[in-house]
C-alpha cells in the first residue's frame, strides 16, 4: 500500500512565535537603533506587553516556549517601535523602580535614576546614626516623588514635605503618593506636597530652623554638557535637567542656601550633583554657613552628592 504523507499545517491565524524568536528579532531592531541593552529592553517590553514578570520571559526563553497572545504581541511591536525611536523604556512601560517602590512615570516627569538611591541611602544612614525617631524631612524638586516617598515609606514616623515647581509634574507626584499609600496606608497624612519654587525663601518658610534633613536631587546638568543619550536629551523635562548656568551650579547653590535656612542646628543636607561639581559645592556650602561639608560617591565610585551639616 502506498505511503500517505500527512502534511501538518499550522492554522492561518497562528502568528504566535517562540519567545526566543520574538526577542531575537526585537533585539536586532533595537541594536540597529543604537540601544545599548537591546536584549534586556526587548525582554522587559515583552514582559510588560504580556502582563508577566521578567523571570517568566526568561523561563519561556529557556524552555523554548511561546509567550503572549496575538493581541499582546501586537502591543509589544508598537512598544518596540517607540523604543527604537529612543523613547525611554520607563515612559513606554509607564513605571520605574526606585528602592522599594514602583513609581508611575511618563512624559513630563524626570525618570528616577539608580544613583539617586545612593543619595537617599546616605540620608537614611545619617538619620539612623543619629537615632532620629520622628524626623522632619524635606525633598526639594520632588519630581516623581522618588526621594520623599522612599523616606516616608521606609522611616516610620517621619514627616516629609515635598516641593515641586511644575504643576504638570506634581500630578505624577500625587499619583505616586496615592499608589504608595495603598501599600503603606500610614503615609497619607505624613507626606505634604507643595507646588512652589524650591529655591524661594518663601517656600516652606514656616519650617525654617526646624528640619532635620533635606534630601534633594535638583536640576544640575551644565548648560555646556548637553546629554548625548537621546533618551535624556529629547525626553527628560529640561526643567528637571539643567542647572541654570554654564557649569550647572546655579540651582544647586540656591538649594544649598534654601536648605541652610530650613535646617535646625546640626541638621543635614544631602544633595545630588554632577560629577564635576563636588569641590565647588563643598566650598559654597561652607561659605553659606554649613559647619561641615564633603562629597559622597555613588555605587560606581563617582562623586555624586554633597553631604553638609549645619
Language model features: what each stretch is:
Residues 1-3, 135:
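Short, low-complexity intrinsically disordered segments enriched in A/P/G/S/L with frequent Arg
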Residues 30, 127, 177, 181, ...:
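Conserved hydrophobic residues forming the short capping helix/wall of the S-adenosyl-L-methionine
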Residues 39, 47-125:
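Conserved AdoMet
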Residues 45, 214-217, 233:
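Hydrophobic beta-strand segment of the Class I
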Amino acid at each position: 500500500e502506498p505511503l500517505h504523507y500527512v502534511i501538518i499545517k499550522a492554522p492561518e491565524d497562528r502568528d504566535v512565535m517562540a519567545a526566543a524568536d520574538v526577542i531575537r528579532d526585537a533585539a536586532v531592531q533595537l541594536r540597529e537603533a543604537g540601544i545599548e541593552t537591546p536584549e534586556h529592553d526587548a525582554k522587559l517590553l515583552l514582559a510588560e506587553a504580556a502582563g508577566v514578570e521578567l523571570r517568566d520571559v526568561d523561563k519561556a526563553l529557556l524552555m523554548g516556549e511561546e509567550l503572549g497572545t496575538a493581541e499582546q504581541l501586537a502591543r509589544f511591536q508598537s512598544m518596540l517601535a517607540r523604543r527604537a525611536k529612543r523613547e525611554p523604556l520607563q515612559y513606554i512601560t509607564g513605571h520605574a523602580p526606585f528602592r522599594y517602590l514602583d513609581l508611575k512615570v511618563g512624559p513630563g516627569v524626570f525618570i528616577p535614576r539608580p544613583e539617586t538611591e545612593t543619595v537617599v541611602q546616605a540620608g537614611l544612614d545619617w538619620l539612623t546614626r543619629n537615632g532620629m525617631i520622628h524626623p522632619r524631612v524635606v525633598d526639594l524638586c520632588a519630581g516623581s516623588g522618588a526621594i520623599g516617598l522612599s523616606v516616608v515609606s521606609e522611616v516610620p514616623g517621619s514627616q516629609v514635605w515635598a516641593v515641586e515647581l511644575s504643576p504638570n509634574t506634581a500630578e505624577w507626584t500625587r499619583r505616586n503618593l496615592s499608589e504608595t499609600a495603598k501599600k503603606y496606608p500610614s503615609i497619607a497624612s505624613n507626606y505634604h506636597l507643595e507646588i512652589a519654587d524650591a529655591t524661594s525663601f518663601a517656600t516652606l518658610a514656616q519650617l525654617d530652623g526646624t528640619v532635620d534633613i533635606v534630601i534633594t536631587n535638583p536640576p544640575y546638568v551644565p548648560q555646556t554638557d548637553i546629554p548625548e543619550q537621546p533618551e535624556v536629551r529629547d525626553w527628560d523635562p529640561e526643567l528637571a535637567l539643567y542647572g541654570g548656568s554654564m557649569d550647572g551650579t546655579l540651582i544647586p547653590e540656591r538649594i544649598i542656601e534654601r536648605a541652610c535656612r530650613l535646617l535646625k542646628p546640626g541638621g543635614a543636607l544631602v544633595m545630588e550633583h554632577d560629577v564635576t561639581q563636588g569641590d565647588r559645592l563643598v566650598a559654597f556650602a561652607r561659605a553659606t554657613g554649613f559647619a561641615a561639608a564633603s562629597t559622597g560617591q555613588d555605587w560606581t565610585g563617582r562623586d555624586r552628592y554633597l553631604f553638609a551639616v549645619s
